[in-house]
């Protein structure tokens, strides 16, 4: 009964591949050898014909099966990412022994369930629990779990979980609550979910179990993926099915919907699967991100859980870059869509949103993609601005709405401003002077300036959707406008002393105050100036500050024509977005 096993999964898998290559050689050689033996007849010099080849082929085949069983089992017993030798005590000494034990246990469970169906009492259900408890030390063996589930069948499997819910969680009608889920994990549903994970992830279940996804109740499926880590393939199949069911398909559609919360919880534990869902199933993933979904579930914990799942899937550096970028595009299109309720809807604002804060925290690597899309729209004639696929299909208007949705949360807005500033520092626009004598230098400066201006443009456009006070709005607008100016100022006007640097920072603060006051006076209707004239004045303030800083720090002053060119360039990059932001807020 059982044995202590030590195995190196990677080495064993390599051996399996080598034996497969040997089987292939034998399979290709055997027909020709058989034909040669038949043709030679009695003159064949060999003694046993092709029989040794048959035995060798079957030796390889049976050894492969045994090794695969051992690999699958040790990975369940020792769930780790480490490589090298893994050790553990197997509940069975062979897959055959595991299969026979599973069939016997399935018979005991079925008999206990039939007895319970006759009496529907506490003691009769205790008998079912006792029969299932015997599985605890055995279900990490995939052959055992597969044989057990095959013997029970999908219908009995679901009934065991449903009967536990009926007896232990009668009030949970749209998925298990966290407390109930915890109790289920420590009882028979948890054991059944673990058995399913062991059997399904190793590819040992028949098609009828995949078809179960189409017919099983939502709470059964959401519990199954929440109670034990299922394979990413199965988890995503469950998700795409649940997320396409009619919103009111549940028996009790007005109850709090814990099913989606438990699905999000499963994705929190499996970032790779969630990243793939976002990238490959944008419509279904969009249901999870929908503002109405978030607000109507009746489960406040859902947004926080979804935020953690998004962070796991999207944080910089995780997974393959192309998969992560496609996942980001789904998130941006979902939250920033034309009819999104994240902004301007009738369900309130997202002023304190963990989702907004997480997305703002993780957005830095894709800011250049967003900026390039806006820059190409602003200046299609400038070379080398266009974003590469798949970002070339993202509408900059959607990007602006997405940023605006995030900026409803003040903390997220601050994070976005910092990310934007860091992005401009990373571009290092000052590597090239706007009036460089070489064509390459000027073109390079224009390219970088277009991208910094485009990001400012997006932030300004997004600000029209943010629900800020007038004072906060004016302060942030002035901050957005000065982001590229601040960078140029620091690049071209380096300070050797802390005192001089403090003075320069004060000068920048002064011009920000001037710009903020201009915006505040306009919003408070303390000036007869129009939004258009205020926008022009704000651009002039930027250019005049740069020109003044150059003179005060002994740098070569801008000529009149250079000043005009700088003003036209800045105005062209941000004027329309700035004007729209002022008109919408001031109106």
Briefly describe each language-model feature range.
Residues 1-114, 118-119, 126:
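N-terminal secretion-targeting helices of virulence/extracellular proteins
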Residues 83-587:
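Non-catalytic all-alpha helical scaffold/repeat segments
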């Amino acid at each position: 009964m059982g044995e202590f096993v030590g195995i190196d999964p990677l080495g064993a898998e390599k051996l399996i591949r080598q034996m497969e290559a040997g089987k292939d050689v034998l399979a290709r050689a055997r027909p020709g050898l058989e034909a040669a033996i038949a043709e030679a007849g009695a003159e064949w010099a060999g003694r046993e014909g092709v029989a040794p080849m048959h035995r060798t082929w079957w030796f390889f085949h049976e050894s492969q099966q045994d090794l695969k069983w051992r690999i699958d089992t040790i990975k369940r017993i020792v769930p780790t990412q480490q490589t090298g030798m893994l050790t553990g005590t197997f509940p069975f000494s062979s897959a055959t022994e595991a299969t026979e034990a599973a069939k016997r246990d399935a018979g005991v469970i079925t008999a206990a369930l039939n007895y319970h169906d006759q009496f529907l009492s506490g003691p009769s259900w205790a008998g079912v629990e006792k029969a299932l408890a015997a599985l605890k030390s055995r279900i990490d063996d995939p052959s055992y779990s597969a044989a057990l589930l095959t013997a029970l069948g999908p219908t009995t499997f679901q009934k065991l979980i449903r009967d536990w819910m009926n007896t232990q969680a009668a009030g949970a009608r749209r998925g298990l609550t966290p407390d109930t889920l915890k109790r289920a994990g420590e009882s028979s549903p948890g054991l059944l979910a673990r058995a399913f994970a062991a059997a399904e992830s190793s590819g040992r279940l028949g098609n009828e179990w995949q078809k179960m996804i189409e017919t099983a109740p939502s709470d059964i499926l959401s519990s199954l993926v929440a109670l034990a880590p299922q394979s990413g393939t199965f988890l995503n199949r469950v998700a795409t099915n649940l997320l396409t069911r009619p919103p009111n398909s549940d028996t009790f559609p007005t109850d709090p919907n814990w099913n989606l919360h438990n699905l999000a919880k499963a994705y929190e534990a499996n970032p790779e699967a969630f990243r793939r869902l976002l990238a490959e199933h944008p419509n279904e993933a969009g249901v999870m991100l929908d503002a109405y979904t978030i607000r109507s579930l009746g489960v406040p914990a859902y947004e926080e859980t979804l935020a953690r799942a998004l962070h796991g899937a999207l944080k910089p550096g995780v997974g393959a870059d192309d998969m992560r970028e496609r996942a980001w595009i789904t998130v941006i299109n979902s939250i920033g869509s034309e009819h999104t309720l994240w902004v301007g809807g009738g369900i309130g604002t997202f002023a304190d949103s963990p989702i907004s804060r997480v997305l703002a925290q993780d957005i830095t690597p894709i800011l250049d993609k967003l900026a390039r899309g806006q820059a190409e729209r602003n200046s299609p004639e400038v070379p080398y601005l266009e974003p590469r696929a798949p970002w070339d299909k993202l509408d900059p208007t959607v990007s602006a709405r997405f940023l605006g949705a995030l900026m409803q949360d003040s903390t997220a807005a601050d994070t976005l401003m910092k990310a934007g500033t860091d992005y401009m520092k990373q571009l290092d626009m000052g590597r090239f002077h706007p009036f460089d004598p070489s064509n390459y230098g000027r073109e390079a400066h224009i390219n970088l300036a277009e991208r910094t201006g485009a990001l400012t443009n997006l932030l300004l456009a997004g600000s029209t959707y943010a629900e800020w006070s007038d004072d906060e709005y004016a302060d942030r607008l002035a901050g957005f406008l000065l982001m590229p100016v601040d960078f140029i100022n620091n690049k071209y006007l380096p300070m050797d002393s802390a005192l001089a640097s403090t003075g320069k920072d004060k000068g920048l603060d002064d011009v920000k105050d001037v710009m903020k006051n201009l915006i505040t006076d306009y919003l408070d209707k303390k000036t007869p100036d129009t939004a258009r004239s205020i926008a022009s004045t704000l651009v002039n303030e930027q250019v005049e500050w740069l020109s003044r800083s150059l003179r005060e720090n002994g740098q070569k002053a801008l000529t009149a024509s250079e000043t005009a060119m700088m003003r036209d360039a800045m105005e062209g990059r941000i004027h329309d977005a700035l004007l729209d932001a002022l008109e919408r807020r001031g109106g």
